[in-house]
């Protein structure tokens, strides 16, 4: 189990589990409980963040939720066609802040699993600023997503609005809602997200 590990290793074990055992993908909604994200075996920033917070707290690590929006172009490539047209111009985004050595450390680099990120790096083999396919980073070739006791980012360069920190994802969604509602949400849940996940799987398999 993770609980007996030193704090640094405990955070790292939970972080690596959520990053790589829960593959990048699109769930039915942002507000899913951690148990549903775990059952899906896939997630994006918000759903993987919910699971990360639940697991960190389960092993005695204090953490909090930081809500944002990101600009839609960050998702272009991972989201294509009708899905991209229907997506809001600014998409609800979040990262997790973990209490470590007397400060809050921002954790965002868990969103893209290593096989998917490696495929992006092969597809775009340049050391430069990159935005698209679920990443927005100053250096795609070395984005700094591994847990080293410091902030990790993979979408930070796409952030538009900052909604501040919350004790839980539920508190945030109660105040700011989620990305889709009504007919758009139904289409996303029943049809579009499956196409998006197929696209992500294609990229990962390259």
Where are these regions (language model features)?
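Non-catalytic alpha-helical scaffold/packing segments enriched in small hydrophobic residues
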Residues: 13, 51, 95-98
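Generic structural hydrophobic/aromatic packing signal, biased to beta-strands
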Residues: 14, 56, 63-65, 107, ...
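Secondary-structure boundary elements
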Residues: 1-40
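His-Asp-centered catalytic microenvironments across diverse enzyme cores
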Residues: 70-206
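Active-site neighborhood of thiol-dependent amide/isopeptide-bond enzymes
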Residues: 26-92
């Amino acid at each position: 189990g993770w609980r007996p590990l030193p704090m640094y290793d405990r955070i790292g074990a939970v972080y690596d589990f959520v990053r790589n055992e829960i593959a990048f993908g699109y769930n039915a909604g942002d507000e899913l409980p951690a148990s549903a994200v775990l059952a899906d075996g896939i997630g994006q920033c918000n759903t993987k963040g919910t699971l990360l917070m639940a697991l960190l707290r389960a092993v005695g690590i204090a953490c909090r939720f930081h809500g944002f929006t990101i600009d839609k172009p960050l998702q272009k490539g991972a989201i294509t066609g009708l899905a991209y047209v229907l997506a809001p111009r600014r998409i609800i985004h979040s990262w997790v802040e973990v209490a470590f050595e007397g400060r809050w450390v921002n954790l965002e680099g868990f969103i893209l699993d290593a096989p998917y990120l490696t495929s992006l790096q092969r597809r775009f083999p340049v050391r430069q600023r990159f935005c698209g396919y679920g990443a927005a980073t100053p250096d795609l070739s070395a984005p700094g997503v591994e847990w080293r006791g410091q902030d990790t980012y993979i979408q930070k360069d796409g952030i538009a609005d900052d909604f501040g920190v919350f004790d839980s994802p539920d508190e945030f969604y109660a105040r700011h809602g989620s990305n889709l509602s009504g007919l758009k949400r139904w289409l996303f849940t029943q049809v579009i997200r499956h196409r998006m996940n197929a696209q992500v799987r294609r990229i990962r398999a390259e």
